[in-house]
């Protein structure tokens, strides 16, 4: 890990002293490798969490650690790359930087929809349509967490729900979930997680 990355991670702890940020930074420092899916997942989650607590510049800096990584055929690794790209897209959309929003979308599409042979592309398109229709939502899990009064699990599932929503937004929205419907839903998830950030631990 080079000094710049270490300085970035240390600056996050100054801006965000909550336990969840300490944990994510520790996880990233422990094994700083882009081939390690746990590290990549921690980078993605850290990026989302920074956006949620209104640290957009830090979120962009964390995203830039992995947003240029090429797809090498391992979707478990690359889903974390497109995860940070969706956060970038959200920030650029807020700032009215439409060209950057388009670039984010194209980067995801090139891998997610157009990688592999025809059969693979057909399957990807099928999955993509289901995701865009909200079939990957975590609303049932969130309800279960509420019933069992498991706040930690509920916060985590709200984060996953947030990430589903910002993915749909980054890809231009859909008939079921146009951008004007997505934005208040994203804001609701953001507010919930921000409110309970001290209790977040995953």
Regions found by a protein language model. Name each.
Residues 127, 131-202:
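Eukaryotic alpha-helical solenoid repeat scaffolds
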Residues 6-10, 45-48, 80-87, 121-129, ...:
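"A position-specific structural signal for the A-helix of alpha-solenoid helical repeats
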Residues 101-114, 190:
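TPR/TPR-like (Sel1-like) alpha-helical repeat modules
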Residues 13-26, 52-65, 100-106, 134-138:
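Helix-turn-helix repeat elements of alpha-solenoid scaffolds
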Residues 1-19:
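N-terminal leader/linker segments that initiate helical-solenoid repeat arrays
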Residues 29-37, 69-78, 114-120, 147-152:
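Flexible helix-coil transition and linker loops at the boundaries of alpha-helical arrays
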């Amino acid at each position: 890990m080079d000094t710049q990355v270490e300085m970035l991670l240390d600056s996050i702890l100054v801006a965000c002293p909550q336990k969840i940020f300490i944990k994510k930074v520790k996880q990233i420092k422990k094994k700083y490798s882009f081939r390690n899916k746990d590290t990549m997942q921690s980078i993605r989650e850290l990026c989302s969490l920074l956006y949620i607590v209104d640290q957009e510049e830090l979120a962009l800096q964390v995203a830039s650690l992995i947003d240029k990584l090429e797809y090498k055929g391992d979707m478990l690794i690359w889903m974390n790359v497109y995860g940070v790209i969706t956060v970038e897209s959200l920030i650029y959309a807020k700032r009215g930087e439409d060209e950057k929003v388009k670039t984010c979308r194209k980067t995801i599409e090139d891998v997610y929809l157009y990688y592999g042979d025809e059969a693979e592309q057909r399957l990807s398109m099928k999955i993509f349509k289901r995701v865009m229709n909200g079939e990957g939502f975590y609303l049932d899990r969130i309800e279960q967490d509420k019933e069992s009064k498991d706040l930690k699990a509920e916060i985590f599932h709200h984060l996953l729900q947030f990430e589903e929503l910002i993915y749909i937004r980054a890809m231009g929205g859909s008939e079921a979930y146009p951008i004007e419907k997505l934005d208040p839903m994203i804001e609701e998830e953001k507010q919930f997680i921000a409110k309970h950030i001290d209790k977040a631990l995953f």
